[in-house]
Regions:
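Glycine-centered hinge/linker elements that transmit conformational signals in sensory
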Residues: 1-30, 73-79
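Soluble non-cytosolic domains of exported or imported proteins
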Residues: 4-11, 31-34, 110-114, 187-195, ...
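Short amphipathic alpha-helical coiled-coil/interface segments
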Residues: 14, 215-226
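Sec/Tat-exported extracytoplasmic proteins
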Residues: 18-25, 44, 52, 59-62, ...
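Short helix-initiation/N-cap motifs at beta->coil->alpha
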Residues: 28-42
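Paired acidic/hydrophobic, glycine-rich loop segments that form the ligand-binding mouth/hinge
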Residues: 46-51, 70-72
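C-terminal lobe and pocket-closing loops
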Residues: 54-65, 77-199, 234-248
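Short, charged, surface-exposed loops that flank catalytic or proteolytic processing sites
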Residues: 203-217
Length: 248
């Protein structure tokens, strides 16, 4: 099991990311999700590519740019690296935003299962859910079919009809029209893998390492993680995740 994270495609992506840092607001390289939501939602930044939390924050009544923003699918690339042939291909590629709802569970050992389930049902009822998706910092995104009806946002939140339609259509088109996606990694060691790539990319963004050097470092760390956990263990867990995706 060899990491591919330091291949040409990923290096090119990190190179683009480093280049993009020239255009971030002051301190933007170190933004967390909350900072990004507040910056775009408050009208301090022009463009946000993330979950739709920042867009929703921009459309709240307390935002200076309410009804002055737009939604569009995430941009793609006009070429891709084919790792099988070892060559670049001039083919457009675009990966979508994945519409997904939060999930919750009650522990089997809980002494108050009925109360816990009752609370979850209350918390997730339609009225509360629709209130939650209207507040950017809550991180509750549309995922029910009823969430993609533009009139919901026009009538309840005072959104401009054209912007509401653009928002709902953008999310629904990516959800229904794209199969070019992979869900987040769900294997033993996932947090270690993520931490290694976060550390490496941070060094590239700070100018301490080139994109290639940074991802070479990440690949070396990933090899250590695989050796520590076991390739077969990771492979088996990954297969379970893929099977789940194939049945959605």
């Amino acid at each position: 099991m060899e990491p591919l994270i330091n291949g040409p495609g990923f290096v090119e992506a990190l190179t683009d990311w480093v280049e993009a840092t020239k255009y971030v607001p002051p301190g933007g390289i170190n933004f967390g999700l909350g900072d990004e939501i507040n910056s775009f939602g408050g009208g301090q930044t022009l463009f946000s590519f993330s979950w739709d939390d920042a867009f929703v924050a921009a459309m709240q009544d307390d935002s200076p740019i309410k009804n002055k923003v737009g939604a569009a699918p995430l941009p793609g690339s006009d070429r891709v690296w084919n790792r099988s042939s070892g060559a670049w291909e001039n083919e457009y590629n675009q990966a979508p935003y994945i519409v997904w709802g939060w999930t919750a569970a009650v522990a089997k050992a809980s002494k108050n299962q009925d109360v816990a389930f009752d609370y979850l049902c209350f918390f997730a009822n339609d009225a509360n859910h629709q209130a939650d998706i209207a507040i950017g910092r809550f991180g509750v995104n549309p995922f029910k079919k009823s969430d993609f009806v533009p009139e919901l946002y026009v009538e309840r939140q005072g959104w401009d009809p054209e912007i509401a339609k653009q928002y709902a259509d953008t999310l629904m088109e990516m959800e229904e029209g794209s199969t070019n996606r992979v869900f987040p990694l769900r294997v033993p060691g996932v947090f270690q893998f993520n931490s290694a790539i976060a550390t490496a990319t941070s060094k590239a963004l700070a100018g301490q390492l080139s994109p290639q050097e940074a991802l070479d470092e990440a690949a070396a760390d990933w090899k250590k993680i695989v050796k520590r956990i076991g390739a077969d263990t990771i492979r088996e867990a990954y297969a379970v995740g893929v099977a789940l995706e194939d049945n959605l």
